[in-house]
């Protein structure tokens, strides 16, 4: 029984690196490791109602991956978002005067 579980898992990379937390699911009868952050799966404690049948009794796996440099478009978008968030944070710190809240 343990041998069948090991055949579904990828072989570990001898060089440790970046790892993604994945949920092992079955799609079209094949087990796949789907990253948790982008998978659209419900929370791990939620009932999986057959839409995402789990491949193993313990569905979580740390999958080896490699870092990919961000493209120029992604970096430009991050800069714009950072500037926007900085402006919003400054606007929240401005005193509005008048009302105070007693605690």
From Swiss-Prot:
Source taxon at top rank? Viruses
- For this entry, the protein name equals 11.2 kDa protein
């Amino acid at each position: 029984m343990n041998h069948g579980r090991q055949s579904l898992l990828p072989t570990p990379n001898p060089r440790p690196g970046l790892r993604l937390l994945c949920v092992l699911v079955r799609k079209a009868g094949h087990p796949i490791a789907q990253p948790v952050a982008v998978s659209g799966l419900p929370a791990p404690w939620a009932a999986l109602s057959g839409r995402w049948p789990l491949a193993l009794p313990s569905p979580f796996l740390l999958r080896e991956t490699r870092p990919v440099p961000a493209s120029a478009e992604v970096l430009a978008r991050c800069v714009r978002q950072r500037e926007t968030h900085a402006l919003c944070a400054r606007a929240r710190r401005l005193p509005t005067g008048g009302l105070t809240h007693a605690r």
